[in-house]
Amino acid sequence: MGNQFKTLALLAALSGLLIAISYWVIGGSSGLMIGIGLAAVTNLLSWYQSDKIALAVYRAQAVSESQAPKLYRTVQRLSQRANIPMPGVYIVPGQTANAFATGRDPEHAAVAVTEGILNILPEDELEAVIAHELTHIINRDTLTQAVAATVAGAISFLAQMVSYSLWFGGIGGRDNERGGNPLGVLLTVVLAPIAATIIQLAISRTREFSADAGSARLTGNPRALARALQRLEATARQMPLNANPAFEPLLIINPISGQFLGNLFSSHPSTEARVQALLKLEKQLPTIA
């Protein structure tokens, strides 16, 4: 319950940040009402369309059992073991190696992996990665992450539009109420995306450890996920998956993890920390299974 409250508070903070941007940029009650409207639309859109948005961002393509038999049967088998509806199965084109899950609940969920991950992971490691993603679905992390990504993306987009407007003739200041202050606008453009990113980090980091543990319980093989994470990190650094940074928290591995600045501003814990946690969990597995 504590984690749920924290997550709801952080999501509310993201929406509040979106409203604040509109207030400072447009000014007064007009800016406030527009901001509230934007926050409402963005949250509703991400709630009902989160799976479609994330899949579109990564250009994921739905596949059938005949098209990707090993992947499809792995998702099917683990879904039955976890006692959840089987999610949609998608493949992201490209040789980078990564995976993610999305959807507002287990009945409206999808699991996506890249072509690269299918080429480099042996069967037990692929199973561990799929189990990790299914745990995100079971824990409803997919909804939280998608809402956070959509709102953070809207904040970054709005801040970018404001910066363009500053270059081409200025904005705001037409409302006779408070708002449209040039310094406030400038600070908003610079600080809002950073604040949105920090809030996203607070939402997503602990969820990766929980999903790793869920994978270990579901497969009974935490070492397989540890090996997969190490393999994925090495490959992702060489061939990062290019997409909107707001949606990077959805991925199982962050390409820049392992570096100090990468860890500081990463939506994921370091791969080293995750591997250590999994190896500790391996010793406890007979007790927790």
From Swiss-Prot:
Gene3D superfamilies: Metalloproteases ('zincins'), catalytic domain. It is a multi-pass membrane protein. The keyword Translocase does not apply. Keywords: Cell inner membrane, Cell membrane, Hydrolase, Membrane, Metal-binding, Metalloprotease, Protease, Transmembrane, Transmembrane helix, Zinc. Its cofactor is Zn(2+). It is an enzyme of class 3 (hydrolase). Its EC number is 3.4.24.-. It comes from the Bacteria. It is found in: Cell inner membrane. One of its GO terms (cellular component) is plasma membrane. Zn(2+) binds at H132, H136, E208. This is Protease HtpX homolog. It comes from Nostoc sp. (strain PCC 7120 / SAG 25.82 / UTEX 2576).
